[in-house]
């Protein structure tokens, strides 16, 4: 019996089948290993998951007003949509801010929650704005630049970059034309970190902590006084 089995297993066709099966298993192993390495490579799935030893997307930071902040766990890039292209402005794209983290806030003059949170965004820019981070206010408002600037002046908001999206081109591109205010944070590579729909206190320690985690660990001790 054993002799017959050995004879069958040593036939050329059977040998080819055996070695073919071994080769297929080896190929599956190589492909699986490559997939795991690719998934674990920094930046392979959109925004970096960690700055230093701390994760950028940290559920522990979602407290207070920031409990409404939603991390972007699927890759989303800052759209290259042109905006600020009204008669008085120069065309701008979010990609123009590449190299620094940005907080983009969509607001309008008719939006009461927007008006309430704008001073806190001004305070955030004054505290953290610089080479690594910038607050960008985008007025998604058909009333136009004059009305938007008058409202900012009335509220005493002057520190952030103020731009227009009168035709809602950018707001639509980020999926936020339906409701305001909407705030979206992008890292220095143009990857969306997350967004918050509705009013928030962006001068709070909780907001500062989220922004600092995106900027880098060297800034994490910086809190509002």
Give the ranges of each region predicted by the language model:
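A short beta-strand-turn-helix
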Residues: 70-75, 80-102
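Thiol/disulfide oxidoreductase modules built on the thioredoxin-like
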Residues: 150-159, 164-216
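Conserved redox-active cysteine motifs that mediate thiol-disulfide chemistry
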Residues: 98, 106-123
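N-terminal targeting signals for export/organelle localization
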Residues: 1-78, 224-225
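Structural microenvironment flanking redox-active thiols in thiol-disulfide oxidoreductases
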Residues: 115-155, 164-173, 209, 224-225
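Active-site acidic short loop of glycosyltransferases
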Residues: 98-99, 130, 157-159
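Alpha/beta-hydrolase fold active-site loops
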Residues: 101-102, 133, 181, 191
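Extracytoplasmic/luminal low-complexity segments enriched in Pro/Gly and acidic/polar residues
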Residues: 213-225
């Amino acid at each position: 019996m054993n002799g017959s089995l050995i004879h069958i297993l040593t036939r050329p066709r059977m040998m080819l089948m055996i070695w073919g099966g071994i080769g297929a298993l080896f190929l599956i192993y190589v492909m699986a290993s490559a997939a795991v390495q690719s998934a674990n490579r920094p930046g392979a799935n959109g925004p970096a998951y960690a700055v230093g030893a701390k994760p950028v997307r940290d559920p522990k930071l979602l407290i207070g007003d920031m409990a409404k902040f939603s991390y972007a766990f699927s890759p989303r890039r800052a759209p290259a949509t042109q905006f600020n292209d009204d008669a008085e402005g120069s065309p701008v794209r979010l990609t123009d801010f590449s190299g620094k983290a940005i907080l983009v806030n969509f607001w309008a003059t008719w939006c009461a929650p927007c008006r309430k949170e704008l001073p806190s965004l001004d305070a955030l820019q004054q505290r953290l704005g610089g080479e690594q981070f910038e607050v960008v206010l985008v007025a998604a408002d058909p009333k136009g630049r004059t009305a938007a600037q008058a409202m900012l002046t009335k509220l005493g908001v002057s520190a952030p970059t103020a731009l227009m999206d009168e035709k809602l081109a950018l707001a639509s591109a980020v999926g936020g034309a339906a409701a305001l205010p909407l705030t979206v944070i992008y890292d220095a590579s143009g990857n969306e970190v997350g967004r918050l729909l509705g009013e928030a206190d962006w001068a709070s320690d909780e907001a500062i902590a989220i922004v600092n985690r995106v900027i880098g660990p060297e800034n994490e001790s910086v809190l509002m006084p």
